[in-house]
Amino acid sequence: MLSRILFFLLICSHISYSQFKNLQNFDERDLRFGYYIGINQYDNKVIYKNNTPYPISVDRAEGINVGLIGELKLNKNLFLSLEPGLHANKKNIIFNERKEFTNYGDTLWVVKSNNIHIPLLLKYSAKRLDNFRPYLKAGLSTSINLNEIEGTLSNNGLENFKFEKFNFYYELAFGVDFYLRYFKFSPSVRGVFSLKNEIPNNTPDNPWTRNIDKFLTRAIFINFSFY
């Protein structure tokens, strides 16, 4: 997958290399719109109350991002970007405390999520060089999980635990604007880090979560934007 992405970017670089500037007046617009498609990979950072020889592990898989972009020009280098979208993902959370669980089904939790993800980001763009313009983005975001995320593991008989439906993040991204003949193409790589504990109400009699102090989401997005 990564090799295909790099090959695609090399093709875009070759196409956008020219002695003439494409879309010369594009950055003069105060407001521009676009859309993005991409892939994501979600992970979790678990902070424990006590050290454990059996940490929780996450089996990650790639998901899909799609969304819209609204970008407001603040000055020649700064832009404010609103990027609401739908992110779909699936991952397996594996509880490795074998002493507590006798059935394999009690240790594996398959989590499917569909998130409405809404970032508000500040974009700093470097000086344009021919048909290239690198940029950095940073900001905050929130997400709403459309799935009912409950800790329903293989008839455990205990009170189910729930993940938070709403989450908050900070985001950092790097990308390059390619000015092509008819549109601007903008690939980027983004790191997303949650600010909120996703399992806040642990009970001491729940073997799945009682040793968890904080359960935080981390993610990597590779987005391809078109304006």
Locations of the language-model features?
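Extracellular/periplasm-exposed beta-strand and loop segments of Gram-negative cell-envelope proteins
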Residues: 42-61, 89-115, 143-167, 197-221
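Short, flexible, glycine/charge-rich loop motifs used to bind or transfer phosphoryl groups or to couple energy/partner
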Residues: 22-24, 125-127, 210-211
